[in-house]
């Protein structure tokens, strides 16, 4: 961790017209050469930030800021710039409220996790019919943020009859009865899938796996905000899974601000490697994020 005097020396050097910093001792024989380069790189990058530095000097917040996990230099999350984080640690509070419950399958559980951990930012919950129409017709959420695929929770008429029109319910894992999280219901609506299938999938062929799923999943949809129980996530999270918050912290810690994203459903091969290397070269990126498609496969 650099001292205030060391930070002041670097900032003063830059403010006086210096075009480079030599880190002879620490980078050559020190215990933390990579970390040293990272923090100095950040000081250089942030030395023009008027919030913390003024006329080559730093204020009392500067050291804490430079050593914090601030995401100021990383591109803002999609939408209004705020990463959606909707988790609940106090599961007992919801247990004693004796709320209605709804059993959900693996696909819906996956959506609850992705929404609540911010993967689907700026989406905060399952869509209502009006929002589905906006997405399919205009590629826009009701907030006017760009979005291209409906995220829905379909249920049967039998389940719909048990739910309140508004308010909180507990979401239950249909496999083992574990409590997944809470859904704060905005609406329960009759859903005519035939009105959406063509624009959704580009076909009405009932052999199409997506079409078949929508037709068979029930003729009601529930919209509302999702919240994930931390206790459930701790039980189910795989060691290779990273949330958006975690990946952003990794980017910051490594001093990466320009990152190439590569989304794939296949094991990377030579063709992928060529594309990835070219993308890194063209964009002069700091790193590449490999984002594999995982989960339930289409059959």
Name each model feature, range by range.
Residues 56-299:
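Nucleotidyltransferase catalytic core that binds NTPs
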Residues 4-7, 34, 266, 270-273:
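Conserved structured core elements
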Residues 2-5, 25-36, 239, 243:
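Catalytic cores of large soluble enzymes that bind and process phosphate-bearing ligands
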Residues 9-33:
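Glycine-rich phosphate-binding active-site loops on the catalytic face of alpha/beta enzymes
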Residues 1, 14, 21-23, 260-262, ...:
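Hydrophobic faces of well-ordered beta-strands that scaffold small-molecule active sites
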Residues 27-52:
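C-terminal helical cap(s) of enzyme catalytic domains, especially alpha/beta-barrels
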Residues 2-6, 37-42, 276-280:
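Short, solvent-exposed amphipathic alpha-helical segments in soluble enzyme
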Residues 1-16, 52-59, 68:
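Active-site-adjacent loop and "lid" segments of alpha/beta metabolic enzymes
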């Amino acid at each position: 961790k650099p001292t205030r005097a060391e930070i002041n020396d670097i900032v003063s050097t830059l403010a006086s017209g210096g075009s480079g910093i030599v880190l002879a001792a620490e980078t050559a024989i020190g215990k933390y050469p990579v970390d040293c380069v990272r923090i100095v790189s950040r000081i250089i990058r942030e030395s023009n930030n008027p919030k913390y530095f003024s006329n080559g000097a730093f204020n009392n917040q500067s050291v804490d800021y430079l050593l914090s996990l601030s995401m100021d230099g990383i591109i803002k999350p999609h939408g209004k710039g705020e990463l959606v984080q909707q988790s609940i640690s106090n599961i007992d509070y919801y247990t004693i409220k004796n709320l209605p419950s709804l059993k959900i399958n693996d696909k819906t559980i996956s959506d609850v996790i992705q929404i609540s951990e911010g993967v689907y930012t700026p989406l905060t919950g399952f869509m209502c019919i009006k929002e589905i129409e906006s997405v399919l017709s205009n590629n826009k959420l009701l907030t006017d943020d760009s979005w291209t695929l409906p995220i829905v929770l379909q249920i049967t008429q039998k389940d719909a009859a048990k739910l309140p029109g508004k308010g909180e319910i507990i979401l239950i894992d249909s496999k083992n009865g574990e409590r997944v999280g809470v859904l704060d219901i905005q609406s329960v609506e009759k859903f005519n899938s035939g009105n959406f299938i063509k624009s959704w999938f580009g076909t009405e062929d009932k052999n199409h796996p997506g079409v078949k799923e929508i037709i068979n999943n029930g003729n009601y949809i529930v919209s509302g905000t999702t919240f994930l129980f931390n206790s459930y996530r701790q039980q189910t999270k795989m060691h290779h899974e990273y949330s958006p918050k975690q990946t952003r912290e990794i980017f910051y810690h490594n001093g990466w601000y320009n990152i190439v994203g590569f989304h794939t459903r296949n094991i990377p091969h030579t063709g992928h490697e060529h594309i990835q290397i070219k993308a890194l070269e063209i964009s002069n990126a700091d790193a590449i994020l490999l984002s594999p498609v995982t989960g339930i496969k289409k059959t």
